[in-house]
Amino acid sequence: GFAQYTECGGIVLIREGEEHLYEDNLSSMSAVGAEYELLNASEIEKLYPGITLTSFGPPKTLADEKFGQTSGGKITSAILVPAAGYVSDPQLASHNLQMAAKNHGADFMFNAPVSTVITDKNVSGGVVLKNGDVISSGSTINASGPHSSIINQMAGIADSLKITTRAVRHEVVYLPADARHFQMGGRFLVDTDAGFYQRPDGADLLIGTTDPECDGMNVVNSDHYNASVTEQWTLQAYRAAQRSPA
C-alpha cells in the first residue's frame, strides 16, 4: 500500500506582540504560493471550542513553581494553513520511495555497514563496505538520518559544514482524542507559548514538543538510547492541557 498524506490543516498560535517573528515565514509561504489565513482571537475560539487564549509563556518545566500560571499576555492571532498535514507512517513512506527508486534502476544493499568514505581533495568517490567491497561513484549522498554526523566525520567534512546535525531524543504523547478537537475537523496546532504541538492521528491525539529552551537537548547515541517513557511524556501532556483545560 501507499503512505497517505492527511491534509488536516494547521494553525500556529501567536502571542500578542510577537507577530513580527513570523514575517519571514509568511513571506516565504507567499513566495511559493502556499495559502494561509490570518485569524483573530474569536476566529480561533470558533475553531477550537473550549480553548483558552491566556499566555503561559515562556514555557516552563513541571519543576517550576510557576508552571500553569498565566504570564499576563494573550494569544491574539494565529496563522491557518489549510494544506498542512502529516504522514503517519514514515516507514511505509520510506518503503514507497524505495520501490519507486528500484523502478528507476536503483539497487539497495541492506546490512552492509560502511567502513570508509572515499575522498580525494574533498571530493567523494564512493564508499568501502565493512566486508571490503568498494562502491565507486561520482557523488555520495548522506541520507543517514541520526547517523549523518558520523558519516560526515568519516568523510572528513564535519568541520567545514555550516550546518551540523545531532541525534536528539524526543518523546511524543498519544492520548484518546477529545471529540471537541475533531468536531470542526482535527488540525495541526503549534503553540510555542506553552511549548507543544498537537495533531490528530486516527482516533488519537499526538502531542510533541516545540523544543523550548527550558527543556534543553537530550543528545543521544543514535544506536543506544532510552526507548522507555520518561517524565517528558507527562510534561507534554500537561502543557497541552493548559491550552484546553475543560
Please state what every model-predicted region is.
Residues 11-15, 79-85, 227-229:
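Short beta-strand and adjoining strand-loop segment in the mid-core
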Residues 42-53, 60-61, 167-168, 230-246:
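Flavin (FAD/FMN) cofactor-binding core of flavoprotein oxidoreductases
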Residues 1-64, 195-197:
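Dinucleotide-binding Rossmann-like beta1-alpha1 core, especially the glycine-rich loop
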Residues 19-23, 41, 94, 148, ...:
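A general structural signal for well-ordered alpha-helical segments in protein cores
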Residues 65-139, 143, 147:
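Helical element adjacent to the flavin cofactor pocket in flavoenzyme catalytic cores
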Residues 131-188, 226:
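Central helical "cap/lid" subdomain
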Residues 161-164, 178-246:
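Active-site lid/adjacent beta-loop-alpha segment flanking the redox-cofactor pocket in flavoenzymes
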Residues 12, 126, 172-174, 197:
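Conserved hydrophobic/aromatic beta-strand scaffold that supports enzyme active sites
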